[in-house]
Amino acid sequence: MATAPSPREENVYLAKLAEQAERYEEMVEFMEKVCAAADSEELTVEERNLLSVAYKNVIGARRASWRIISSIEQKEESRGNDDHVSTIRDYRSKIETELSNICGGILKLLDSRLIPSAASGDSKVFYLKMKGDYHRYLAEFKTGAERKEAAESTLSAYKAAQDIANAELAPTHPIRLGLALNFSVFYYEILNSPDRACNLANEAFDEAIAELDTLEEESYKDSTLIMQLLRDNLTLWTSDMQDDGGDEIKEAAPKPDEQY
């Protein structure tokens, strides 16, 4: 007779079901229960990827909504439709509250449990990168002192991740490449530093190319995909530094079978 699954295993399975059903809010809840069950123990690679996918989808939907509403707001403003602008701003504020709450939830989990329990180099980089990502998402819509604080927290997390990645992970490692991708996007979009963005992306790409023959088979697909995204962004950024941002900038979006 098969032994009954532990609550942790059960919640991992439920998270996978929720993912298949595209019920990402519930997927987050199940993975938060997994984190609670793990206590001070490190999550498995599968568990951390499921957690990342859950939050990425929950935040991704709101980030997309915010961009659409902000675009409509700009159009209505240019037309002088003040009544509409006021309504849109209230609605945008509602989305921003949701974004703040989601980011706050994962950042608290990262600081209280995930980063302290990370033992291996790749898990430390994974979680510090994740911390940088969610501070960056806050910086996308915050203004004034709050934006400055979010940007500084992003930079601090990405730099800490970069130090460990450079010391412990190969240039072709998908987590190191994913960090370089998102860090360069931060320089370009949040700090308005296209030169630094291009330098970082270019260096990561060149270092990976130089060691491509050492790439392990299981991570070949993941690594080459991120390298292509780095190349896409470099092409976009260098083609016209004055571009209005109409083209979509690529960032690392993990799937369950991808290690970044």
From Swiss-Prot:
Compositionally biased tracts (Basic and acidic residues): 247-260
SMART domains membership: 14_3_3
Species, as recorded: Oenothera elata subsp. hookeri
Cited InterPro entries: 14-3-3, 14-3-3_CS, 14-3-3_dom_sf, 14-3-3_domain
Protein name: 14-3-3-like protein
Source species, domain of life: Eukaryota
Region of interest: Disordered: 240-260
PANTHER family per record: 14-3-3 PROTEIN
Family under the similarity heading: Belongs to the 14-3-3 family.
